Amino acid sequence: MVVIRAPLKELEGRYGREIVDLILRYSSIIGYSVDHDEELKIEFNPDRPDLFSFPTLMKQIKIFFYGEVEIRKPQIRDDAVKVTVSKGVRDIRPYFSALIAEGSSIGVHFDELINYQEILHASIGKDRSKMAIGIHDLEKTGDSIHYTTVSRNQRMQTYDGMEGTVDWIIKNHEKGIAYGRLLPGTGRSVAITDNEGNILSLPPIVNSYRSRIDEGTKKFFVDITGTDLNSVKFAHHLMSNFFSSLKYRIRTPSIDGLPSRETEIIRAFDFRIMRPARRSIERYLGEKMDSEETITHLRRMGYVAEPGYPEIAVYVPGYRVDVMGEADIIEDILKSKGIENIEEKQIFIGKFGEPLFMNKVKDLARDTMIGLGFQEVMTFVLSPASYLQEYTGGVRIQNPKSEDYSVIRDKIYPDLLDLIARNKKHSLPQRIFEIGDKIVGGKQRTALSCVIADTRSEFSTAKSYMQGFLARFTSENPVIVPQMIYGSIDGRSGSIKIGEKIIGVIGEIHPAFLERFSLAVPVSFFEIDLDEIFIANMDHLGL
């Protein structure tokens, strides 16, 4: 969750006495919590970073309630300000973008700017590892700026007056101690410098005193560096939106040394076009909506929209980094209309429901495992890629919110090992199982996986439980084909075969694999593909 707060009287002075009423009304549309007394506190879900400051939030509120539609124009390139990117940065923090914002003195919005910068560092930037933002007073930097590498022996003065070499700053400044791990331990460091080689900032750590901003700054230069192009792209448009919310004029400098593909990806993200089908909108909403009403709702939510048939042309602002497809746009139409204004309809079903065959199979497998003395558990379908070094699922999450949930699992037993590790305080033996989904070779499969953690757990332990389980479902005897199974001891693992079909795997977990979960107790396991075994034995099951 993301929290912003400010004294209520200050906000009323900036935005008017109706600010609390407007924010409360808008909260029922977007979905965030508000507390207010002497201080106004708002707690957001992490999916709308464009709202994480009072200026940007109030901009969207005015668009929604007052129709103050922003006529967005492409960012004009300012050839008077030139940025040169050196090749040396490509091995450290390769991605770069920049913008210029010019207007009246930042004044009372200074703290909001700094807070928004830090919120983006924590959320979009993943604590500065993927992206970091530097904000400078352009009137102090000159019009020629360089993104380059510098010697760790070069001296600089930080924004708060600490002076020393780059190496000393990294090791002793509070920001260096916190973020120095993001730079190589030796060699040169990346830096933003002026034309004379003076350091303006040391991404992703600290800005210099030379280009320090204050309440009187009118002309800003914003640099965005990172290790992830999407994060840099998102931050560019979010920072542009912050300044445009304060009526600043936004331009981009002339940048030399970057691949044109990267700059085009960042530029094209603003007002990218999506074309939701009218039929899809009606299907999701459950009722017909004419073109004029649809366009009205889209404009209230900050889009530029043009009528059309069978599709509507929707231009998505760059700061709406949460919009990934037509479902997100239709969700915004629903928010604008209000779910309470959707007519309720009775659903008529022509027959009584009954369990799917596979659900009957799962129930039978569940009852059998409980009868064998196992306890059922449920773990996440998303797993960390670090669990699955031999990953065969073929489905990875793009831009995961956490590296702990970066792939859709292709095997279940590593998740069960993690669960055992989190419950080491409980007495042994621990016998648990899960019936769940996984992806193998891009196809979804349903599997039963179980682990036995005990001081005497070994390959034969898992084998006896596996035979007891399969005896309930097939008259054929399973055969174990010796094979090295991921995470298992070679010679104590294999594939489970019935007839000509491989239906699963079995093994005793290798001590080195157990150490990754901080487990000292022996563990054995088996994992069976329910789709394979039960389709082949439907007659024997009697379901």
Swiss-Prot record:
Cystine connections: none
GO cellular component labels: phenylalanine-tRNA ligase complex
Subcellular location, record wording: Cytoplasm
E.C. number: 6.1.1.20
Presence of the UniProt keyword Magnesium in the record: yes
Binding site for Mg(2+): 322, 328, 331-332
Cofactor requirements of the protein: Mg(2+)
GO molecular function: ATP binding; magnesium ion binding; phenylalanine-tRNA ligase activity; RNA binding
NCBIfam families: pheT_arch
PANTHER family: PHENYLALANINE--TRNA LIGASE BETA SUBUNIT (PTHR10947:SF0), PHENYLALANYL-TRNA SYNTHETASE BETA CHAIN AND LEUCINE-RICH REPEAT-CONTAINING PROTEIN 47 (PTHR10947)
Family the UniProt entry places it in: Belongs to the phenylalanyl-tRNA synthetase beta subunit family. Type 2 subfamily.
The protein's name: Phenylalanine--tRNA ligase beta subunit
Organism: Thermoplasma acidophilum (strain ATCC 25905 / DSM 1728 / JCM 9062 / NBRC 15155 / AMRC-C165)
